[in-house]
Design a protein with these regions (language model features):
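A short linear hydrophobic-aromatic micro-motif
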Residues: 28-33
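Surface-exposed aromatic
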Residues: 38-44
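Short glycine-/aliphatic-rich beta-strand segments at the starts of folded cytosolic domains
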Residues: 1-11
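C-terminal structural segments of small proteins and small subunits
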Residues: 6, 19, 47-72
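Short amphipathic alpha-helix segments
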Residues: 9-26
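Acidic/polar N-terminal loop/beta-strand segments that form early-domain functional surfaces
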Residues: 34, 45-47
Length: 72
């Protein structure tokens, strides 16, 4: 399953912190950022399990950033 999130994260240091936390909490998840996109995309792939969508949103928000599912 793949989930795409819109964020307001602009700096690589912040993305590294968020990605580290995601990968520690959910080892089966692969997550990447695309900061060149206007929506500052967070792409999350769950190979063996569904993506914990709300938990990912909550994690990013507790770090002081906006995060929402990007709908087609």
């Amino acid at each position: 399953m793949i989930e795409i999130f819109k964020t307001d994260i602009k700096h690589k240091a912040a993305t590294k912190q968020v990605l580290t936390e995601i990968h520690q909490q959910w080892p089966g998840i692969v997550a990447t950022f695309d900061l060149e996109d206007n929506d500052k995309i967070l792409r999350v792939v769950g190979a063996w399990a569904p993506v914990p969508t709300q938990e990912i949103i909550d994690l990013v928000k507790t770090r002081g950033f906006m995060c929402e599912v990007l709908h087609d």
